Amino acid sequence: MRRVLYFTNTRPDAYATMSDPIRLIVGLGNPGPDYETTRHNAGFWLADHLADDLRTAFALEKGFFGMLAKARHAGENVVLLKPITYMNRSGQSVGAVACFYKLAPEQVLVLHDELDLLPGQVKIKQGGGHAGHNGLKDIQAALGSPNFWRLRIGIGHPRSLGLAQQVADFVLHPPCREEQQQIDTVIDRCRAVVPAMLAGDFALATRELHGANGT
């Protein structure tokens, strides 16, 4: 059972350094029960919790090639999206939604699994490359810009975890119990700072998340 953390409205003047507020939150993953518990679906896991926190629910929107949830936070519209195009075609869904709502890349936050961070670690980043993550690569092509925000949820790398698996196999398998607990803890930390990101205060969100990484 998912624990719900209802967001409270936060006044914009509570934040000192502001970026563009986030209006589209995209959780990356693969659709269907075969993939539900796999590491590659960490973005879906967080998106599901955020829908609960924002008191909304996902529904299929075929025209957007994904599951969509609409919410209000601090008087503003927020859209949550889980593409059902499979990871490699995520941009088809993200591009369609961003175009319809006339959103700039800077107003988009993508939640995704990150091989270069260990389970229990998380980082916020804007722009940059895709580091071989095909979902990010396709979104960058669809938006015509790398300047969207990313919330990188650490899942570890087979090499860093002492496993002999190939990366393609690793991301399509569930984490072990200890790793899952570490990822779940990170997801709760992310949920706690999403209100700041929705208000555009990525400086606060970054301090809170990166400071708790212990790195």
UniProtKB/Swiss-Prot annotation:
The active site is at 40 (proton acceptor). It is an enzyme of class 3 (hydrolase). TRNA binds at residues 35, 86, 88, 134. Its EC number is 3.1.1.29. GO terms for biological process: protein quality control for misfolded or incompletely synthesized proteins; rescue of stalled ribosome. One of its GO terms (cellular component) is cytoplasm. Transmembrane segments: none annotated. The record marks 30 as: Discriminates between blocked and unblocked aminoacyl-tRNA. GO terms for molecular function: peptidyl-tRNA hydrolase activity; tRNA binding. It catalyses: an N-acyl-L-alpha-aminoacyl-tRNA + H2O = an N-acyl-L-amino acid + a tRNA + H(+). The record marks 113 as: Stabilizes the basic form of H active site to accept a proton. Keywords: Cytoplasm, Hydrolase, RNA-binding, tRNA-binding. It is found in: Cytoplasm. NCBIfam families: pth. Hydrolyzes ribosome-free peptidyl-tRNAs (with 1 or more amino acids incorporated), which drop off the ribosome during protein synthesis, or as a result of ribosome stalling. Catalyzes the release of premature peptidyl moieties from peptidyl-tRNA molecules trapped in stalled 50S ribosomal subunits, and thus maintains levels of free tRNAs and 50S ribosomes. Belongs to the PTH family. Monomer. This is Peptidyl-tRNA hydrolase. It comes from Bordetella pertussis (strain Tohama I / ATCC BAA-589 / NCTC 13251).
